[in-house]
From Swiss-Prot:
UniProt keyword Metal-binding present: yes
Catalytic activity reported: tRNA(Lys) + L-lysine + ATP = L-lysyl-tRNA(Lys) + AMP + diphosphate
Cellular location(s): Cytoplasm
Subunit record text: Homodimer.
Protein name per Swiss-Prot or TrEMBL: Lysine--tRNA ligase
Gene that encodes it: lysS
Protein family according to the UniProt entry: Belongs to the class-II aminoacyl-tRNA synthetase family.
């Protein structure tokens, strides 16, 4: 690995020198990769349990058995100081030749380097500057590192290297570990919220015979035994709604979706969604539910506060959140003429002002949505529900009883990006079949993201699905908001990258 401050040649030289030490240890009868060492306490707990108020005599009676990776190392001949790091934090150790034994000190301890993993036993004391330290009485090398870590004061800063070699990033950048602890906490809190409200967590297929549930290009694979193509799922929606047909009234799933699309600060081909469906509710009740869910998660990870600092701005999650139609949002944020917002010619002029050339295949709904996406979406910083989408761009959503051209649908936007998408579900099998057919026609006309016709799903609807509300929430984007991450790859442990070389 080439770091910011170390050339490939320098790194190769260090690797060679470390391998020489590794062989010297083996020749001395030392196993550089043993097993069996069991720490009895983590490093942060040592510090918490032994505060500044403890007198030196009492402190010296405290014995600990700890392990960690060496992050700092200072040799002073017969005395060595090192800083160990484990998942919980850091702690200094001190090894003296006269205490651990001259032979062990010279043949083993002096061959230990930054990056090595060490287990030690000893008692506690404080240095002259007051730093809590373990006086090493016994030690064991647990893992010899043959690659050097990035230099102490420069760290690992190159983003490509950080994402590609996340294991190094996690070692040297403690704030990165905190991001993924927060991510885990967010998912755990969502799961608790759903379970406490009677939702059943389920698992649906990751490989689909027919891609569906969203408009996106799928990844294609092949099942050799069945000699058939399968598709990595772009959404679990149609399977989850089959469960509603089957009698489960509240279901949710937290899992991966896959979409064969481009990479961007907001998009990764593999991403995590929480999708849920509830019988006997609609999209308006889901807005209240979503507001409560997100607020609960924000307070849990933000020390009870509903204000979050994100990329230099303060996001206020306290309610009630704004609710606007796409047309109302265009009027508000683009200063468009409300009296003309339904005119085709006026919409085309708005699109042209944004550099958008309307395609002849676009109906007014698609044109309106494109104007919203290009001209408004990035301006929606405070949590905002965009509601009542055109039915033509919502092929799985129920029509409004008041206006058949409108879908009972909303999307939640925060910090200029979509966080959730929800609707009152379409449960009329004939209407759904008609919309599937229009999607097939769009696909035949060249729209690679249009949906396929799923005859089995139509068959399921023909058995009767109760009135249902459903929603998908982007976990990755929600975590971005709560960790002040500008790029989705910051919140994915192993984001998709171009192949090296």
């Amino acid at each position: 690995m080439e770091t910011n401050t170390m050339s490939q040649q320098e790194e190769n030289q260090q690797i060679a020198a470390r391998k020489v030490k590794l062989e010297a240890l083996r020749e001395a009868g030392v196993n550089p990769y043993p097993s069996g060492f069991k720490p009895d306490i983590d490093l942060a707990s040592v510090s918490r349990a032994n505060g500044n108020e403890m007198d030196p005599a009492t402190l010296e009676r405290v014995s600990v058995k700890v392990a960690g990776r060496i992050m700092l190392l200072r040799n002073f001949g017969k005395l060595t100081f090192a800083t160990l790091q484990d998942e919980s934090g850091r702690l200094q150790i001190s090894a003296q030749r006269d205490v651990v034994g001259a032979e062990l000190y010279s043949t083993v301890f002096r061959k230990i380097e930054v990056g090595d993993i060490l287990g030690v036993e000893g008692h506690l004391f404080r240095t002259k500057v007051g730093e809590l330290t373990v006086q090493v009485e016994r030690f064991e090398l647990l893992s010899k590192a043959v690659r050097p870590l990035p230099e102490k004061f420069h760290g690992l800063e190159d983003v490509e290297t950080r994402y590609r070699q996340r294991y190094v990033d996690l070692i040297v950048n403690t704030e990165v570990r905190e991001i993924f602890k927060t991510r885990s906490r967010v998912i755990s809190r969502i799961r608790q919220f759903m379970e406490h409200r009677g939702f059943l967590e389920v698992e649906t297929p990751m490989m689909h015979p027919i891609p569906g549930g969203a408009t996106a290009r799928p990844f294609v694979t092949h099942h050799n035994a069945l000699d058939t193509d399968l598709y990595l799922r772009i959404a679990p929606e149609l399977y989850l709604k089959r469960l509603i047909v089957g009698g489960f009234e509240r279901v949710f799933e937290i899992n991966r979706n896959f979409r064969n699309e481009g990479l961007s600060p907001r998009h990764n081909p593999e991403f995590t969604m929480m999708e849920f469906y509830q019988a006997y509710t609609d999209y308006r009740e889901l807005m209240d539910f979503t507001e409560a869910l997100v607020q609960d998660v924000v307070k849990d990870v933000n020390e009870g506060e509903l204000t979050v600092a994100y990329q230099g701005q303060e996001l206020d999650f306290s309610g009630p959140w704004a609710r606007l139609t796409p047309a109302e949002a265009i009027v508000r944020y683009m200063e468009a003429d409300a009296a003309r917002i339904t005119e085709r010619g006026y919409l085309e002029s708005l699109a042209e002002s944004l550099g958008i050339k309307a395609e002849t295949s676009w109906d007014d709904g698609m044109l309106l949505l494109t104007i919203f996406e290009e001209g408004v979406e990035h301006k929606l910083m405070a949590p905002t529900f965009i509601i009542d989408y055109p039915i033509s761009v919502s092929p799985l959503s129920r029509r409004s009883d008041d206006n058949p051209d409108i879908a009972e649908r909303f999307e939640l936007f925060i910090a200029g990006r979509e966080i959730a998408n929800a609707f009152s579900e379409l449960n009329d099998p004939a209407d759904q079949a008609s919309r599937f057919q229009k999607q097939v026609e769009a696909k035949d006309a060249g729209n690679e993201e249009a949906m396929h016709f799923d005859a089995d799903y139509i068959r399921a609807l023909e058995y009767g699905m109760p009135p249902t509300g459903g929603e998908g929430i982007g976990i990755d984007r929600l975590v971005m908001l709560l960790t002040d991450a500008a790029n989705i790859r910051e919140v994915l442990l192993f984001p998709q990258m171009k192949r090296e070389g």
